[in-house]
A protein has these predicted regions:
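Surface-exposed, charge/polar-rich loops and edge strands
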Residues: 1-337
């Protein structure tokens, strides 16, 4: 099995460039049962009920893209991926990495500069942020939202690339399935007997990275930090159904079931996969040849191809600011055929 097994034709016109003003007005392809029903996310409370646990990833996107100038002239760019030390050291994607020797200092403004450190390969470097005050305050002041490369329209309101329940600024990308939810939708779910729980998985760049190897056995996921609180784990154990909002939530829950409630995970969810926690997935429509589609096949089976065809034919909007799908976990075929 290789990346070509997860290829499909995605027209540019199907890629949503801007978010909807009304978040839950996004369309929802309800494929939990055998019959596909066209709904909106606002219908979600009617599709869940007592005993269900809805789990969200409450990470917040850090405005982590820093545009810098070199003292010798020219420009550079740093995308902060994760903090390493309390002294302002980060792992970052640096461009142009090969032209910046270790020890090079780049200026963001008069107060914030970046010292380029060890080469980690793949364009990644250790960098140290130097400023007179708190580092995160400087990043929020100077940084830009690291939007996916397929979004070419200027985002007028950066908060539209944040979930309404986001907390700690740490991620390089949003857990986009959660962008559709509002407090009103979540309150309606609670009123119907649904328990809402949260976890944190710090989303990295694998969200945007296509699979480039010919064999999935050779694909390696970058590690991401995650933490699943004890209350979330307990709720999932007692749930009638665990409904994960987004692929990052799936990755965190299934990592916790294997490796413990907190840590760094490089779990690559691919067929065949033994899901131990998640029963239903709320997810956006993903890029061709991506690890997220591989996860979707592991979860829902090859049916996703038919569902994507239906969505494209019916004018659904795809990718980060696009519409959503609700799908149940495929059951093992025990027919012996």
């Amino acid at each position: 099995m290789g990346p070509e097994d997860f290829a499909y034709q995605l027209p540019d016109a199907a890629i949503a460039q801007v978010p909807l003003e009304d978040r839950p007005a996004a369309r929802l392809l309800d494929a939990v049962g055998d019959r596909v029903v066209h709904r909106t996310v606002r219908d979600l409370p009617s599709l869940v009920g007592p005993g269900d646990v809805l789990v969200v990833n409450d990470t917040r996107v850090l405005p982590a893209r820093l545009r810098l100038r070199r003292r010798t002239g020219g420009s550079a760019e740093v995308l902060l991926l994760r903090t390493l030390e309390g002294d302002g050291t980060w792992e970052a994607l640096v461009r142009p990495s090969r032209k910046l020797p270790e020890g090079t200092t780049l200026a963001v403004d008069d107060d914030l500069s970046v010292e380029v450190g060890r080469d980690l390969g793949d364009g990644r470097r250790h960098v140290r942020l130097l400023c007179s005050g708190p580092v995160l305050e400087a990043v929020h002041r100077c940084g830009e939202m690291p939007l996916p490369p397929y979004l070419t329209t200027v985002l007028e309101d950066p908060d539209r690339y944040q979930t309404v329940y986001s907390r700690r600024s740490a991620s390089a990308a949003a857990p986009t399935a959660g962008l559709h939810l509002t407090e009103q939708v979540l309150d309606a779910c609670r009123a119907g007997g649904v328990r809402i729980e949260s976890l944190e998985l710090v989303v990295g760049l694998d969200t945007f990275r296509p699979i480039t190897v010919d064999d999935l056995d050779e694909h390696r996921m970058h590690r991401e930090d995650y933490c699943v609180p004890a209350t979330t784990l307990e709720a999932c154990r007692d749930a009638s159904r665990v409904i994960a909002v987004g692929t990052t939530t799936v990755r965190a829950l299934e990592s916790a079931a294997r490796y413990g409630a907190e840590g760094r995970t490089d779990l690559f969810i691919r067929p065949p996969f033994d899901f131990r926690v998640v029963d239903v997935l709320l997810t956006n429509f993903h890029q061709p040849r991506s690890s997220l589609l591989v996860m979707l096949e592991a979860f829902a089976g090859p049916r996703w191809r038919e569902l994507y065809g239906t969505a494209l034919a019916d004018g659904y909007r795809f990718l980060s600011f696009g519409d959503a799908m609700l799908v149940g976990r495929a059951r093992p075929d025990r027919s012996g055929a």
